Amino acid sequence: MSMFCYQCQEAAGCKGCTVRGVCGKTEDLAKKQDLLIYTLKVVSLYNVEARKLNLVNKEIDNYIVDSLFATITNANFDENIFTERIEKGIKYKEELKKQISAAGGNVNLNEKTEAVGVLSTENEDIRSLRELLTYGIKGMAAYLKHARNLSYEDSNIQGFMSKALAATLDDTLGADELVALALECGKYGVDAMALLDKANTETYGNPEITKVNIGTRNNPGILISGHDLKDIEELLKQTEGTGVDVYTHSEMLPANYYPAFKKYSHFVGNYGNAWWKQNEEFESFNGPILMTTNCIVPPKASYIDRMYTTGVTGYPGVKHIENGEPKDFSAIIEHAKKCAPPTEIEKGEIIGGFAHNQVIALADKVVEAVKSGAIKRFYVMAGCDGRAKTRNYYTDFAKALPKDAVILTAGCAKYKYNKLDLGDIGGIPRVLDAGQCNDSYSLVVIALKLKEVFGLNDINELPIAYNIAWYEQKAVIVLLALLHLGVKNIHLGPTLPAFLSPNVAKVLVDNFGIGGITNVEDDIKMFENL
């Protein structure tokens, strides 16, 4: 087999990609990523030993985080970057060995060098649990990277990441120990999302109810995609007064909800939809596009010269803006000045900004609506969007929900229904968008607040159903976080993860009520009877 990857929802045949990734990843790139993941596990093995001796190396901790983020689906397609990261990892391993040895520690660790890659673990269930843990750690890394960009860090979370990665090399750990580690990963996932929430809100203010323009103006523009709020802050500052407008795309939409960004008159609104439509939407935008994180779709020749990457992202032939304090966006700004204004593809407004602080401010109104029966049930429909036509299920599901149901969402899954006219209940919109995928944390805070207000003992007693669309590894850490918090009866779609072996899937079904989706009518009946 030339390659094997099943980390995302688009894994070929719900089994795995073996020739080329559906994402566009080549065999050579897949092998480089496998080798980098193995390198990170070995570095983590020594990092754990070093930490036992109070040898904490922030540079190595950050290297692990950034490298994991680069391997997330659709983040980086540049083989050279992975070669550099592998070489850097080998250097760090030797550094750690010297430090451990000098401190009298053990350097005779089992690096398991016989084989690398997913299939190097023969036992299907152990392999499944190791990958579940690895993908959760990848998702966590993304959130830690964004928090660190705003100078918020947590050494304990980074210590757990090394512990978890090292554990995937330990053949003495059985299924029970790995399940426990996965749930512990969920605990640290909550911590990571809380850290990022704190970083974002203390830096830019709490998101607030906002109507976001989805039309265009007649100035040239820059389209910023991905998740990194530090990047959009620096871009807005540097484009001010230049005659260049700024638009968000896909997961950057929630930047419009933050008070700190509303002062910029050239911050127009949001252009387009979820990541997978970018081939058409980047073409019609006419101006340059800045990818701050995933998701990159292999670009068309017609606009690749207008595309820029930054941070951990990369694509061969695409210009990369290096890190800096601040980053220098002058090249993309000058490029924009030479481009035509965006072609308008839609008009109107969408509403969002319902993160935990805003919803809790409306708590009295929400509680009264629940008590009066005006709101019968909340549906958490957070997660990711994707190319599969089966994802139209989520549009149909939103349309078919009874008028007394409210959707709580975060992540690009929202694009399946955030432009539908679903109305409101007593002034409360029936789609409450908390923000990016990491803002699933807000939905947890809201649920815990409602549990407190209603005096319930168990979060599962709330009238909340979980119908989550997943795509990549950030959705995995959100899932593990929910499981850690004791949330049960979560349904995942459009398919269950290919990396869950039948036995591991059974454990999740039996212990947590995890399920898939069937059809809209039957699923709504099922949720109403939970």
Swiss-Prot record:
Q: Which cofactor does it need?
A: [4Fe-4S] cluster; hybrid [4Fe-2O-2S] cluster
Q: List the disulfide bonds.
A: none
Q: Name one GO molecular function term.
A: 4 iron, 4 sulfur cluster binding
Q: How is the cofactor bound?
A: Binds 1 [4Fe-4S] cluster. Binds 1 hybrid [4Fe-2O-2S] cluster.
Q: Looking at the record's lineage, which domain of life comes first?
A: Bacteria
Q: Cellular component terms, GO, for this chain's entry?
A: cytoplasm
Keyword terms of this UniProt record: 4Fe-4S, Cytoplasm, Iron, Iron-sulfur, Metal-binding, Oxidoreductase
State what protein this is by name: Hydroxylamine reductase 1
